[in-house]
From Swiss-Prot:
Signal peptide interval: none
Name of the molecule in the record: Protein translocase subunit SecA
Gene name as annotated: secA
Molecular functions per Gene Ontology: ATP binding; metal ion binding; protein-exporting ATPase activity
Protein source organism: Bradyrhizobium sp. (strain BTAi1 / ATCC BAA-1182)
InterPro entries on file: Helicase_ATP-bd, P-loop_NTPase, SEC_C_motif, SecA, SecA_CS, SecA_DEAD, SecA_motor_DEAD, SecA_preprotein_X-link_dom
Residues at which Zn(2+) binds: 934, 936, 945-946
Length: 950
């Protein structure tokens, strides 16, 4: 109460911050007449002037006002669009490294140009992050007109580019791309062996579009580069046959936590089935050697009980394709990890693909926190403001709309069953369609969108076939005639190719669009339809300019007329009076786009995103959610109380309860889920930070090694540290000479360093100390390496040392990642022993890291002491086969996006007959099998001789 009163008197913190920008907005506006008088060349020259001012010591803040004014003028001349005052405020928020929350249709894409241009003047590169390739291409092509006019270059990073194209795009002043592409490029760069092969040039400033989707929905899901393991398809198919043999009493399903566990009876049954199939090792299912089997049994159970076809995934062309729960889009190429995707393939009886091993990974949380400055834009971030500040130190600033929002958000209607709910939705669609009001129906899954589509078909509606040319002609013709066309479009993962087109035309009179959640986000729905989209579609192939101009005028007239029809599609409703009260009241509900939600999402933000599609730039609109007690949110989070309430109210079949209390109760349930998900993300981040700290050390060290012309000093330090550890192990400090393990030391020197030294003789010398012993061994090892340098020359040796060091580091780092994953999976059990799992994880991860570094010293020293160089020419080190993938934001399971990367061409050398090989000339050997005898005549296998480091 007191807080509300204070806000009334003094305004909220957000209001005060927005007011604080007004002086600079006024200053920018004051420059407008002056800049309007400049010629194009004079306006373009301002970029060089700004750069000169920065070089003289001015800051970006010092030149913000003239720079923003310059961008506004350039936009007017190139795009015909002028930044509103509120858009200038949005640009300042972005420049300050915060989140600008702007409603749909307020021009976020144009707002970004202000902060992008200003920060690009620093010459360090600005990254604009979008959610898909289509938006990256669209926004870059559109906004590059402003940047190009002002003398700045623009690049685009999308799937399918090679490294040379990526490097050029990153070298531009401004780079547009998707969050996945930026993250994968960072991981791939840190697997390269030469600096010149790296494509990114640093992380200075990023503006993230749809920031809530990327930094929250996908926050806990890592980007992963992986390599394939052995094929085990028969094993998965065998395991899959066991699940149908189980009864529901054999396992417990927890939908809230998305887990399934075997009961005691289920374990016994599975044990018997495994034993009969010859898959059980030892006596019990829970013997150590069966850990992997138990894991895959659980994954098969999850595949059958928690994952539903056409909701979580679809089967297309013999492949299981994941569906993104937030957008309803297909994610071709992405795969669940830990054997879950293989379990789904076995369940659906399609070809089981091999599993993968993690080679490198990073979460978006840790990737985006690397930027010196990070900012974001979205229409819905206020509900997650605490999390965005807590994790990313980003404040959410709500930017006022240019025109007041005129959308009517109605109370939810709650029905007992889904059948009743769908009947009510159908009736509402028919009423809206009769007055030509366009309707967008949001669904939570493909399955639900197709149930609704089936309902519409049963009642005489026809689905638009977007595969045919001019698919919307009938809809346009009906709108011109002022009659309902009874046509509908479905936008889900099955029809994602036409996504932008379907969404853009969802504002045509009489249009009915069924969309899975926020599919099509990033494309505005304009009342009357999209001028750009229709011109693109309807003038394609017209070469005569006069004919083309006439067609464009016809389209413009069409859209203006359609807009008027939609604005007038109001509904007049008479509200029945309560007994004994005044006569019935008449209410006029607005026209515009009508949003119908078919169920509530776990997150209020996703619901707000759906609502926000209507009411853009002051247009009228309305929204309403239709719910049932059988909906997932209601069923999992407390429908029992609502059910008993409806029973007490005597609610009949087909009747709904509509009351603000219901909305508040649902909002509280959503807040609980959001708080739980925030805690999960925060906890996961604490664990991921442990790996992230180690990742930064390794990646920074790799870059330093590549930058160094010679790593000889590093190699010598590693060799000396290893020898020191070896001597300390066998010759303990303060021990008597007779207590020394001389034989063990001599044996390890031979095994690791490949040198035989008279250590036993040295140990017998009078008064010899361990320091003297250490010094002699180091001297002999150094002389051995110096001889190799003398034999091959310093240039060759520098290359060999760097290559072996980087390759060994990468190999051990990959093994270390696997160890950390295994540790992470079991560390939670420490909580039962009253120990903090996070502290235990930190401690053990550090111990593993130290062990890896010690192993690195030994492995690099051993390889360099034994290496023999065969080829005369320099060869690139060969990277393992790699695939890029990312994890599902809803379930927390890894989805793997197979983007096969071949960074080094494979050798095409052919085998050469033994008699044609010269033992002293490796260039005559051709391709030698690893297990063949080495052609040099040593008697060793090739892999243990010249083939070891060739």
């Amino acid at each position: 109460m007191i807080g509300a009163l204070a806000r009334k008197l003094f305004g909220s913190a957000n209001d005060r911050r927005v007011k604080g920008y007004q002086a600079r907005v006024n200053a920018i506006n004051a420059l407008e007449p002056e800049l309007a008088k400049l010629t194009d060349e004079q306006l373009k020259a301002r970029t060089a002037e700004f750069k000169a001012q920065l070089a003289e010591g001015k800051t970006l803040d010092d030149i913000l006002v003239p720079a923003f004014a310059t961008v506004r003028e350039a936009s007017k001349r190139t795009l015909g669009q002028r930044h509103f005052d509120v858009q200038l405020i949005g640009g300042m928020v972005l420049h300050e490294g915060d989140i600008a929350e702007m409603k749909t249709g307020e021009g976020k894409t144009l707002v970004a140009t202000l902060a992008v241009y200003l920060n690009a003047l620093a010459g360090k590169g600005v990254h604009v992050v979008t959610v898909n390739d289509y938006l990256a291409r669209r926004d870059a092509g559109w906004m590059s007109q402003i940047y190009g006019f002002l003398g700045l270059t623009t690049g685009v990073i999308v799937h399918g580019l090679d490294d040379a194209e990526r490097k050029l795009a990153y070298a531009c002043d401004i780079t547009y791309g998707t969050n996945n592409e930026y993250g994968f490029d960072y991981l791939r760069d840190n697997m390269k062996y030469r600096l010149e092969d790296m494509v990114q040039r640093g992380h200075y400033f990023a503006i993230v579009d749809e920031v809530d989707s990327i930094l929250i929905d996908e926050a806990r899901t890592p980007l992963i580069i992986s390599g394939p393991l052995d094929d085990r398809s028969d094993f998965y198919n065998t395991i899959d046959t066991f699940v149908p043999k189980l009864d529901k009493s054999d396992y417990d399903v927890d939908e809230k936590q998305r887990t399934v566990t075997l009961t005691e009876a289920g374990m016994e049954k599975i044990e018997t089935l495994l034993r009969d199939a010859g898959q059980l090792k030892g006596e019990s299912l829970y013997d150590v050697e069966n850990v992997s089997v138990v894991h895959h049994i659980n994954q098969a159970l999850r595949a059958h009980t928690l994952f539903t076809r056409d909701k979580d995934y679809i089967v297309r062309d013999g492949e299981v394709v994941i569906i993104d729960e937030f957008t309803g889009r297909m994610m071709p190429g992405r795969r669940y990890s830990e054997g879950l995707h293989q379990a789904l393939e076995a369940k659906e009886h399609v070809q089981v693909q091999p599993e993968n091993q993690t080679l490198a990974s990073i979460t978006f949380q840790n990737y985006f926190r690397m930027y010196e400055k990070l900012a974001g834009m979205t229409g819905t971030a206020a509900t997650e403001a605490d999390e965005l500040f807590d994790i990313y130190k980003l404040e959410v600033v709500e930017i006022p709309t240019n025109l007041p929002v005129a959308r009517l958000d109605e109370d939810d209607e709650v029905y007992r069953t889904q059948q009743e709910k769908y009947a009510a939705i159908l009736a509402e669609i028919e009423r809206a369609n009769s007055r030509l009001q366009p309707v967008l129906v949001g669904t939570a899954s493909i399955e639900k969108s197709e149930v609704l589509a089936a309902y519409l078909k049963q009642h005489g509606y026809k689905q638009i076939d977007f595969g045919s040319e001019r698919a919307l002609d009938k809809l346009y013709a009906a709108a011109r005639a002022g009659k309902p066309a009874k046509l509908f479009a479905v936008l889900n993962a099955r029809f994602h190719e036409q996504e932008a087109y379907i969404v853009a035309e969802a504002g045509v009179p009489g249009a009915i669009t069924i969309a899975t959640n926020m599919a099509g986000r990033g494309t505005d729905i304009k009342l009357g339809g999209s001028l750009e989209m229709r011109i693109q579609q309807e003038t394609a192939g017209i070469t005569d300019e006069t004919e083309k101009a006439a067609k464009i005028e016809q389209i413009k007239a069409d859209i203006a007329r359609f807009r008027e029809i939609v604005l007038k599609a109001e509904e007049t409703v008479e509200i029945e009076p309560a007994k004994g009260s005044k006569p019935a009241k008449t209410v006029v509900k607005p026209g515009g786009l009508y949003i119908i939600g078919s169920e509530r999402h776990e997150s209020r933000r996703i619901d707000n995103q759906l609502r926000g599609r209507s009411g853009r730039q002051g247009d009228p609109g309305r929204s309403k959610f239709f719910l049932s007690l059988e909906d997932d949110l209601m069923r999992i989070f407390g429908s029992d109380r609502l059910d008993s309430m409806l029973t007490r109210l005597g609610l009949k079949e087909g009747e709904a309860i509509i009351h603000p209390w219901i909305n508040k109760a649902l909002e509280k349930a959503q807040q609980k889920v959001e708080a739980r998900n925030f805690d999960i993300r925060k906890n996961l981040l604490k664990f991921d930070n442990v790996q992230n700290d180690q990742r930064k050390v390794i990646f920074d060290q790799r870059v330093e090694l590549m930058q160094d012309e010679s790593v000889a000093e590093t190699i010598a330090d590693m060799r000396h540290a290893f020898i020191d550890d070896l001597v300390s192990k066998h010759v303990p400090e303060h021990a008597y000479a007779e207590q020394w393990d001389v034989a063990g030391l001599k044996e390890e020197l031979k095994r690791v360093l490949d040198i035989e030294l008279p250590v036993d003789e040295w140990a017998k010398e009078e008064g010899i100390a361990d320091e003297e012993l250490l010094k002699r061994i180091e001297t002999h090892a150094d002389e051995r390496m110096a001889a190799k340098v003398g034999q091959w020359g310093p240039d060759v040796m520098r290359y060999v040392e760097k290559t072996i060091l980087l390759q060994t580091l990468d190999h051990l780092w990959r093994e270390h990642l696997v160890m950390l994953d295994h540790l992470r999976q079991v560390i939670g059990l420490r909580g039962y022993g009253q120990r903090d799992p996070l502290q235990e994880y930190k401690s053990e991860a550090f111990t593993l890291f130290e062990a890896m570094i010690a192993h690195l010293r030994e492995a690099v020293t051993a390889q360099l002491m034994r290496v023999e160089i065969v080829p005369p020419e320099e060869q690139q080190p060969v990277l393992p086969p790699m695939q890029a993938h990312h994890a599902n934001p809803t379930t927390g399971e890894d989805e793997m996006a197979f983007a096969n990367v071949s960074l080094v061409p494979s050798s095409g050398a052919a085998p050469v007959p033994a008699e044609a090989r010269n033992p002293n000339d490796p260039s005559t050997w051709g391709k030698v099998g690893r297990n063949e005898d080495c052609p040099c005549g040593s008697g060793k296998k090739y892999k243990h001789c010249h083939g070891r480091y060739a």
